[in-house]
């Protein structure tokens, strides 16, 4: 297995532009293409999963709604949320299937939050990561030709109010939380968090990291 992982820090980006770049990357990659992680924040946007139900958008606003091809229902992205897109050839990894990749992503977040003294956990029937019953991280993947794209979105220090305009991930009344609810503002920083996410993800899947 090629155990090299390229990490790209992309800053603040338009959702649709990055989504199309992910699709292009996945469609054109071959057996020699290295796996990549894209770290990004997005301008405010609601994204609807491939099987998303329109009734989960409760209130229209000036925030655009984009139909996506990832799994899951509607969610919200905005600055102050660390998004980690996972562009991996699953076939390269012995004993790794889609469910195990989801578990690895959830454990990446659990281990990252533990470094801040936060006890978090996944739910078997509702992908993502939770703290005291509130959701702190959403997760949705798409698999094409045995390769993953899309990934996770971890709330760090953002305006959570627009989550009230939706049933987050299709769950009515689901409360959201973020890292800034539990730590000092200076620690609720996407750059600091992203380094921890990459460290734990690489350790879980046995990658060597190259940052671009």
UniProtKB/Swiss-Prot annotation:
Keyword Ubl conjugation among record annotations: no
Catalytic reaction annotation: octanoyl-[ACP] + L-lysyl-[protein] = N(6)-octanoyl-L-lysyl-[protein] + holo-[ACP] + H(+)
Annotated ranges, domain BPL/LPL catalytic: 31-209
GO MF term list: lipoyl(octanoyl) transferase activity
The UniProt record lists the keyword Cytoplasm: yes
Active site: 169
Top EC category: transferase
Residues in coiled coil: none
Example of a GO cellular component annotation carried by this entry: cytoplasm
Any Pfam family hit: LplA-B_cat
EC numbers: 2.3.1.181
InterPro entries: aa-tRNA-synth_II/BPL/LPL, BPL_LPL_catalytic, Octanoyltransferase, Octanoyltransferase_CS
Localization per record: Cytoplasm
Database matches in PANTHER family: LIPOYLTRANSFERASE 2, MITOCHONDRIAL-RELATED, OCTANOYLTRANSFERASE
Note: In the reaction, the free carboxyl group of octanoic acid is attached via an amide linkage to the epsilon-amino group of a specific lysine residue of lipoyl domains of lipoate-dependent enzymes.
Family: Belongs to the LipB family.
Protein name (database record): Octanoyltransferase
Species of provenance: Haemophilus influenzae (strain ATCC 51907 / DSM 11121 / KW20 / Rd)
